[in-house]
Structures are given as structure tokens and as C-alpha cells.
Design a protein with these regions (language model features):
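PRPP-associated nucleotide enzymes
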Residues: 1-147
Length: 147
């Protein structure tokens, strides 16, 4: 009999209750909140800023993927299969046929989008993931006022 513990499981975000509606998720993750608190401190400088931003976005994209993307049931013959025919893992994993696009808005900083893209190409089929780039700049009038 195949292992069934990982079939049809329910994934739940660690969330704070709120009245913003079902499409808003306020994460209650002590690791992410600790990293965010550290990032906000004025004494934190480069290269730690980049490391924290990268780590935070990596965790956020994994959380979003786990909560929002569809799953499919799969069976995997493990490395132990040569020793026993019972060495088959069966469970729900990410649907590898999902398509994804990340948009890099250069004015807002490129690192978050790059982290999302790199994470998605490792979790999904790379040919199903695309990264688009949008370049933006402020426009000022003759007096230097942003318009």
C-alpha cells in the first residue's frame, strides 16, 4: 500500500485576522517579521540590506506559490526503489504545467522581481516562466517639479 499522508492535504497560511477581504493576506510569520524589523533599522546597511530583501522575497514567493498555485497528485519511485518496490512516494505537489510571469519594474528596484523569477524557474518548468521588464522614470517640468 502506498503512503497516503501527503495526498489531499490542506495548506494554510499563518495569517492575522482582518476586515480587508479574502484577497488580502496579512502574514503572521515570526521569521519574516523578524527579518522585516531588522531591515527597517537605520543601522542596517549594505550588503545586509540586499541579503534581507532577497531572503524576505524568497520566503514570500514560496508562501504565495504554496497558497495560490494548483497542485497535482504524483508518484515518485525513490532511490530505495531498487531495494524494495514499496519505495514509492505518493502525494500532492505543484502542478508543473502552470505558467507564470513576473514583471520587473525598474523604477521600483529589480531585486524582488529577479528573486521571484529565480524561485519560480526552480519550482515550475523553466519554459513556463517569463520575466518582463518595464522601465519607468520621473518626469519633471521646467521648475524641477515632478509631474
Amino acid at each position: 500500500m502506498l503512503e497516503q499522508a501527503y495526498q489531499g492535504y490542506t495548506y494554510r497560511l499563518p495569517e492575522l485576522p482582518h476586515a480587508y477581504g479574502e484577497q488580502v493576506h496579512l502574514l503572521a510569520d515570526p521569521v519574516l517579521l523578524s527579518q522585516l524589523a531588522r531591515l527597517c533599522r537605520p543601522e542596517v546597511v549594505q550588503p545586509e540590506i540586499t541579503t534581507l530583501v532577497r531572503d524576505i522575497y524568497h520566503s514570500l514567493v514560496r508562501t504565495v506559490v504554496a497558497n495560490e498555485l494548483p497542485r497535482q497528485r504524483t508518484e515518485v519511485k525513490t532511490r530505495m526503489f531498487e531495494s524494495t518496490p514499496r519505495a514509492v512516494w505518493c502525494g500532492d505537489v505543484l502542478d508543473e504545467h502552470v505558467r507564470a510571469v513576473t514583471v520587473n519594474i525598474a523604477r521600483a528596484g529589480t531585486l524582488p522581481s529577479q528573486v521571484v523569477f529565480e524561485t519560480l524557474v526552480h519550482l515550475l518548468r523553466p519554459e513556463q516562466v517569463r520575466q518582463d521588464h518595464v522601465y519607468m522614470a520621473r518626469v519633471t517640468d521646467d521648475h524641477g517639479v515632478v509631474t
